[in-house]
C-alpha cells in the first residue's frame, strides 16, 4: 500500500486523483465538496453509475431529495463526525446502491466527501485503509482550492450584514458593491431567523452549515450568516412572480421535518420577516423576524406564536405589555388563584383556560385539543368561574386573560 500512497501524494489535481482511486479500486467514485457540490467523478466502467450518481453528475450537485433523505437517516450527521470510512446501505427510493463514504479532511475540518459505489464486491479492509489514508490528501487539495471561495463567501456575508444594518444610502449603491464582489442579490426576499435560546454551541453551528448546504443545493440565491449568535437566512428569489413568503414557510417545514432539532440541547425559536422587493428593506425584514423571536422568548415557547411576522397579531405587543406590567407591578389575581390551585391539587385549570380561549370558548374543539370529554371541560370551566371573578362572556376580559396567560408562562 505504501507504493500506492506515494502515487496518491504525487497528485495535485483532484480530477486525476479521483481517476486514479477509481482505477485502483475498479469502482465508481464521486467526490463532493463539504456543501455537497460535485467536484470530480470517475468510473472504471461508465455504465456502473447508479441513478443517484447520475443525478448528481447531471445537476453537478447532490439532488435535494437525496440530501433530505440523508438528513432524515442521520447520514449527514455521521459524515461530520465519523472519521473513518463507513457504509451506506442501499436506498431504492432514491436510486442509491450500497456505497462506502469517507470525509476528506484537512487540519480537522471536513473539506468534502468521497463516495465509492461497491457494486458486486465490498471493499476489503486493506482497500478501506487505503481510502482512509488517501482522504487526507484529497482534503488538502480541496482546501487549497477553497481559499478563494471562502473569501468570496465572507465578502458576501459582510455585504448582507451591512445591508441589514442599513449602511447603504441607496439600492444602486448596494447593487454596485454586490457587482464589485461578484455576489448575486435577489429580486425578492424574506429574512428568516433561527435563535438558540441558550447560546450558540457547536450543534447550532453544525445546523447552520447544514442549512447553508441545503439552500445552496436548492437555489444558490439565498444567503446564510450568523449575527449575534442568530442563524440568519435570506430566503430569496430571482423572479417577482414566485412567492418568497411561501418559499420561506416551505423551508421552515422542511427544516422541522428533516433537520434534527431534538439533538440541539436548547430550544430553537423561529421568526420570518415580511417579503420585500427593495433591498434596503433587508433590515426591516430582519427586525420583523426578531420581533417574532422576542414574542417566543417572552412566552417561553413557540407553541402558540406563529413563525410569520405577518401573522403575529397581538403577540407583537407582548414586550411592551410585559414592560408596563413590570413597572406597575401588575398581577392578575384570578390567574394567580388558578395557578395556586394547579400546584396544590395537580389540576390543569390554567392550561384548560388557555386552550378554551384559543378555541373562542367553543367546547368541542377545546375538549378535543385537551383530549378530554366535553363534560369534563364544562366541569373545569365551572370550577374556574366559581373560584374567580372571571366573566368569560366578556370579550375584553377574554383578551386580557389570554395576554396575561402568555406573559405568565415566562415566570
UniProtKB/Swiss-Prot annotation:
Does Oxidoreductase show up as a keyword for this record? no
What's one GO MF term for it?
A: DNA binding
UniProt note: phenotype after gene disruption: Mutant loses the ability to utilize proline as either sole nitrogen or sole carbon source.
Task: List UniProt keywords, sorted A-Z.
Answer: Activator, DNA-binding, Transcription, Transcription regulation
Q: Name one Pfam family in it.
A: HTH_30
**Which biological processes are named by the entry's GO terms?**
positive regulation of DNA-templated transcription
What top-level branch of life does the organism fall under? Bacteria
The record's induction entry says: PrcR expression is not subject to autoregulation and proline induction.
- Purpose: Activates transcription of the putBCP operon. Requires proline as a coactivator.
* The family this protein is said to belong to: Belongs to the CdaR family.
- Return the protein name: Proline-responsive transcriptional activator PutR
Q: Which organism is it from?
A: Bacillus subtilis (strain 168)
